[in-house]
Amino acid sequence: ALLHHVPDIINVPRAGIVHRLDKDTTGLMVVAKTIQAQTQLVTQLQSRSVSRIYECIVIGVVTAGGKINAPIGRHGQQRQRMAVMEGGKQAVSHYRVLERFRSHTHVRVKLETGRTHQIRVHMAHINYPLVGDPAYGGRFRIPPAASVTMVESLKNFPRQALHARFLELDHPTTGKRMSWESPLPDDFVWLLSLLKQDREAFIG
């Protein structure tokens, strides 16, 4: 798709991609059109001057925000997965609560580092795995006496409930600070609306 819109990036390593999103994660990502821009943007990522903020829906009621500083490496047996482990690469995430529901929480996460599956691994590590993410413990949880629609929506949510919401960086040529925000996708908004309806029906 990138090559269709910007054919010249075939000459840039990794088709200009500066950082990746996990499969099925929606939202913003950085792509450079030249090698020079890619090099500069990678440097910004490594120096942690790029601001990347995500939103997710997790299983469980998160009591407060916080910081997760837990190293991440490749899982010893299941090589497609990552895990918190001694000897892994440093990984730091900052999270805060946006909204609480009966059995779930809408959370915002700011990345300080950018390890593979970082948010998914870190939130599971503190026992709040993402909705729709069975690879990291996100088996669906049903609020007591929830509606059939609520149950089916949680059970069949087709992906991890994770969205790259906000991105801020310095333009690689001009140095101007730039930012972008991506609206939440329809499936995410729909699930939030169901969770709100469920909370209001039982708590008011």
Regions flagged by a language model, labelled:
Residues 41, 115-123:
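Short beta-strand segments enriched for Tyr within beta-sheet-rich domains
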Residues 58, 94-97, 130:
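Conserved hydrophobic positions within beta-strands
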Residues 20-21, 61, 98-100, 133:
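Residue-level recognition of beta-strand microenvironments
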Residues 89, 112, 122-204:
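Pseudouridine synthases involved in rRNA/tRNA modification
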Residues 1-81, 92, 181-197, 202-204:
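RNA pseudouridine synthases
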Residues 102-109:
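Short histidine-centered loop motifs in beta-beta connectors
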Residues 59, 109-112:
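A structural micro-motif recognizing beta-strand termini
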Residues 2, 30, 56, 95, ...:
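Residue-level signal for inorganic ion chemistry
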